[in-house]
Amino acid sequence: MVQLNQDFINSIAKDMPAHLTMDDFISYSSKPLRPSIRINTLKISSDEFVTLMAAKGWTLDPIPWCSDGFWVALDNEIQLGNTIEHIQGLFYIQEASSMLPPTALFDGLDNSSEYTILDMASAPGSKTTQMASLMDNKGLLVANEYSSSRVKVLHANVQRMGVYNTALTHFDARVFGEYLYHQFDAILLDAPCSGEGTIRKDPLALRNWSLEENASIIETQKALIESAFLALKTGGSLVYSTCALSRSENQEVCEHLMSCFPQAVEFQSLSELFPDADKSCTSEGFLHVWPQIYDSEGFFIAKVRKVADVERQKPLPKAQRNFPFTAANNKTKDELSHYFKHTFGISLPKDGLIMERDLEYWLFPAKMADFIGKMRFQRIGLKLADGLKKGFKVRHEAIMALSDKHNAIELNESQAIEYLMGRDIPLQDGGKPQGEVILTYHHCALGVAKHLGKRLKNNLPRELVRDKVISAKAKTEL
């Protein structure tokens, strides 16, 4: 049984609802989490994926608050992160409770594909990619992460999942209320917290828990929610969430926001967000998810609507200069579009901006035009290709995000594993060399190869070559 910090037990007992018991809390906290995944509908439908994986011995049990989320029961032990399907971005390994904040934010958000949305604390990217999927890669999703090392992880997951409506930033999120005041239609603040709800995933999560340590976290949470509210447009929605369980990191932070802007804050009830949501709903309409309620991690979710204008707290910052990208001219855009269509059968999205930097060609979200000069961005949109003396060289991430099920060579499982391990694929009766071709598995993109007639020359970027790739239906390593 998990060893819980006694100070934590004493503290949390005061916050536990009367209808729940500490014995049940400790019992569920001692159980391993049920594995759960979210299907990436930017690449494959949930129905297609369920059918596909059922044939491989997977049993997928729907998560009631996320239409694309499933608990997974497997016929044998499989390292999900090493499967072909995970590497090619067909699913994200995501704890079930963490799917709740995006679901709450997008509930009632019509035409979300046209919105500008902020994810204030994004890494490693589970909620960012979930929101991008809900937006169908449209609109603009600004994804911020304070930790430089975690920005890299965020970017890797955005790429793997084929997301291209994002602009990544690397700031202390307290600056958003100043730099991007009144800019966002909706905001998710999944705030840094004590992690009290993650004990089932990490038995040592509460080893150093203390009220003193939490006090500084709470001050940060209050500053972040103020910043988020200032960055939100009037009429917009803000979801505040944590994986903490205490009132001090949850309800009291929301009450702090109400005290700061009493005329502008309206709490929205989440009691009908999904069947049985009322089991975790507080009197304010927040969801306070304890592990024993849904057999999940602990989580807290509150939804706030901004019902009145709030004055800017600080002067408008100076515009950022020296933006390194320029809009591509019509000739370049036509040549790039022809290259993608003629070589790969891909039509570039018409609602994006084709931008260039030196000999790099990028696809930016159209709404990015409104943000240039307002803040420094780490990475925007999707890198399409590099320029050559004659023509272009496609980027792997462009194929992973834009390719469809046509104009490709379908690999079998053993060939797909070989490709992801950086090896060339021999061909029998390969015919004449065809140049650059898209490779697929399950008719979803794996990457690009050069068809040389008798073999497919592997063009997988070196940093993406894997030492270990496994079948989703067996533990056999090839």
Swiss-Prot record:
It is found in: Cytoplasm. Gene3D superfamilies: 3.10.450.720, Vaccinia Virus protein VP39. SUPFAM superfamilies: S-adenosyl-L-methionine-dependent methyltransferases. The active site is at C243. InterPro entries: Methyltr_RsmF_N (IPR031341), MeTrfase_RsmB-F_NOP2_cat (IPR049560), MeTrfase_RsmB-F_NOP2_dom (IPR001678), Nol1_Nop2_Fmu_2 (IPR027391), Nop2p (IPR011023), RCMT (IPR023267), rRNA_ssu_MeTfrase_F (IPR023545), RsmB/NOL1/NOP2-like_CS (IPR018314). Pfam families: Methyltr_RsmB-F (PF01189), Methyltr_RsmF_N (PF17125), Methyltranf_PUA (PF13636), YebU_pre-PUA_dom (PF21150). Specifically methylates the cytosine at position 1407 (m5C1407) of 16S rRNA. This is Ribosomal RNA small subunit methyltransferase F. It comes from Shewanella woodyi (strain ATCC 51908 / MS32). The lineage of its organism: Bacteria, Pseudomonadati, Pseudomonadota, Gammaproteobacteria, Alteromonadales.
